[in-house]
Amino acid sequence: VGNNTIIDNGAIIEGNAVIGDNCIVRNYCQIGGGSSIGNRCIIEHCAEFSGITMDRVHLYHYMELGGIIGTCTDIGAATVCGGLRFDDGITEHRVRGRREKPKEYANSSYLGDFSRTGVNAIIMPGCKTGVYSIVGPGVLLNEDLPDNTMIMVEQQTVKKHWGPEKYGW
């Protein structure tokens, strides 16, 4: 645990983990064993994380993520990053133009530096977000998101009359 780091109020750290300087880890969050947390990170209320964060990563409010998170990344409330596939397979990745199937951590999430997620964003197993990218609120990301790209949901809604007569009490 680094200098000036606060670990408080029900934080759970499983097994061995490295936590950098000037971090705040509190309010019933959970850090998986073997994780490495950079400097000046905030891991807060009920956030669950396992993997590696670079410096100045903010993980808040009921989110779950396993993987590698780049510098100055902000993960929105209730963001979920899946780590298992229904077919129990491993995700194929494109690395420098080549297709690869890593033996380890293929289904982890990889979020680039200065990226963000909105409330209730879902990132499917093995998806990567580029540098300066945004996964907007309510988006289900099922493919890699390039650098300098924002993806948002375009929602259609329906309004109807509603009142106490509908309840039948």
Can you name each region flagged by the protein language model?
Residues V1-M54, Y60:
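Acidic, glycine-rich loop-and-beta core segments that form the ion-binding/anion-interacting portion
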